[in-house]
Amino acid sequence: MNAARTYGLPVTQAPSLGVTDFAALGTYVRLVTTDATRIDEARDLLQTGLRALDEACSRFRPDSELMSLDDNVGGRCVRVSPLLAEAVAVALRAADLSAGDVDPTLGNALAAVGYDRDFASVAAFGPAVRIVTRPAPGWQRIRLDKAAGLLTMPAGIRLDLGATAKAFAADKAAADIHTRLDCGVLVSLGGDIAVAGPPPRGGWVVRVQDLPGRSEDEPTGPTSTVAISAGGLATSSTAARRWIRGDRVLHHVLNPRTGLPATSPWRTVSVTAATCVDANIASTASIVRGSAAPAWLARLRLPARLVGADGSVVTVAGWPASADCALEREGDGRPEGPAGPKRRAVR
């Protein structure tokens, strides 16, 4: 996605709000605070956190901690930083809760279809490449002791944390900024949105759009404006991060069962949940699950908006609405709390 573009566009405006935009992690970042006087401090905190995440988790930096694993693990147990351990734990949880629809062991598969560098450097057109069906090695082969900071994975596996890293960063940054500065905050990383603290009156108003575009531009394609007061909103799409090799259109949402770009009736899926990470797990898995996604999301009671390849829109579970549902496996037998189901299954 172009650094000046996003899917979830925070459009709440008021004189008391602080707003700042910049580029990071190969995408567009918007930060909003309910106290305009704290926006500079908040920006410093966010930029510091994003730099640390990039240094730990980037697949496109040869000096990142993640890339060093290719040379140093190879079936051995190695010590990793607390930040990388946390990011890997988030990715493994996503794989578990999505029954493998969101799998972090797709690094080699993404490189094979042409996504082997920051997306801004991926050529839009190129000669045909040999594309082979090859399932992901499988997230179950990764062993992580998060408390001890120890990671073990077989030789030949390349991790890609891109499916969850931005959502993880948004949740982490929003919570940290709220705690440190005692104000409401919204963090949007390429449309993965997390909020924390007291919202502005009427909630955080966000425009969700099918095709990317700048907030000041007239949106292209179907749009929806929603207000969220807590948790997160995430959008997964095959409409922007796409490229052509020969006569084949490729995109970055892979089906772990084939290692190839997912064939889906949905070009965009937006979900609200208790956290941005949970919303992102559900939105990405929905692209992979295809026609089964609406019933699955409805069963989880996760408000969602799905846009078909023809531009048709399907909404489920009361969209537009915020959700306080977090994700866990179906059929775990846990009782529901008095306020209704706080956790919902994902299988």
Residue ranges, per PLM feature:
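Mature catalytic core of soluble alpha/beta enzymes
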Residues: 1-347
